[in-house]
Amino acid sequence: MAEFNREAYSERERSAASMKTLLRKQELVNSYKERLQRSNGFVVFFNFQGIDAYPLTLLRLDIKDLKGEIVVGKNTLFYRAFSDTALSDHRDIFIGPTAALFAYEDPVAVTKKLVEFLKETFDKEWEGRIKGGLLDYKYISPEQVKELAELPSKEELIAKLLGVMMAPVTQLAMTLKAVPQKLVLVLKAIEEEKSKGGQ
């Protein structure tokens, strides 16, 4: 009977574990690439250090309601996933604690929510938290992310557009409503004149 070789067995175990780890890392890289594709090339990276788990969970839920997603990941895997984009020249984004914000519908709305959260959480120090990202697969600086957050959201733009479109209709309705009212007032005045004249 062959003797059990503990070292050879341990080596095989380590090799299998290493292969599982590599496969898991590749799955994560692929999932980040897929998220970027689903978000039409939009992602914003931010430093989440100092944010407790509960507020971060609440932010994630708010972002999810806006059809977005926050992913916390390893910088090396983020870089590997986005190295074939405009972020390849901005490796400094992937230093320190990093989370990625994806938007699957309205990038402005999710960016507004993130900036609002960072302002509430970090007060004056919030600006250094935004690292930059991609908009339509083009690099955007932290300053451009802040500018994006100041734009009106898709819902706000639709409301303004409807307001502009409805203004002439509302004005026409008011004018049409005013004509019979004025006619009634004129007829009442004539009736009063006749009744005064008849007395």
UniProtKB/Swiss-Prot annotation:
Family statement: Belongs to the universal ribosomal protein uL10 family.
Function: Forms part of the ribosomal stalk, playing a central role in the interaction of the ribosome with GTP-bound translation factors.
Xref: SUPFAM superfamilies: Ribosomal protein L10-like (SSF160369)
GO molecular function terms attached to this record: large ribosomal subunit rRNA binding; structural constituent of ribosome
Keywords of this entry: Ribonucleoprotein, Ribosomal protein, RNA-binding, rRNA-binding
Coiled coil: none
Gene Ontology CC: large ribosomal subunit
Assembly and interaction partners: Part of the ribosomal stalk of the 50S ribosomal subunit. The N-terminus interacts with L11 and the large rRNA to form the base of the stalk. The C-terminus forms an elongated spine to which L12 dimers bind in a sequential fashion forming a multimeric L10(L12)X complex.
Source superkingdom: Bacteria
Alphabetical list of InterPro entries matching this protein: Ribosomal_uL10, Ribosomal_uL10-like_sf, Ribosomal_uL10_bac, Ribosomal_uL10_bac_type, Ribosomal_uL10_CS_bac
Entry protein name: Large ribosomal subunit protein uL10
GO biological process annotation, one example: translation
